[in-house]
């Protein structure tokens, strides 16, 4: 079972809001996650990002691989 850190879409139509989640790589985009690790709101100025670094580090130690977008969010907020 490969674990990924990726975004899952929330919010309403044309007002996206994303949660950063740890999820099985075979699960659909909005499927049931293993853990919530933060959120990303691109619709406000400035862009709002909150990441629980302890949870992210825990999942990275367990072998989770971040998606490209999550990787760039982690780099910007470190």
UniProtKB/Swiss-Prot annotation:
Sequence similarity: Belongs to the bacterial ribosomal protein bS16 family.
Pfam families per the UniProt record, alphabetical: Ribosomal_S16
Keywords tagged on the record: Ribonucleoprotein, Ribosomal protein
Domain of life: Bacteria
Molecular function terms, GO-annotated: structural constituent of ribosome
GO biological process: translation
GO cellular component: cytoplasm; small ribosomal subunit
InterPro entries: Ribosomal_bS16, Ribosomal_bS16_dom_sf
SUPFAM superfamilies listed in its UniProt record: Ribosomal protein S16 (SSF54565)
UniProt source species: Maridesulfovibrio salexigens (strain ATCC 14822 / DSM 2638 / NCIMB 8403 / VKM B-1763)
PANTHER family per UniProt: 30S RIBOSOMAL PROTEIN S16, SMALL RIBOSOMAL SUBUNIT PROTEIN BS16M
Disulphide connectivity of cysteines: none
Protein name: Small ribosomal subunit protein bS16
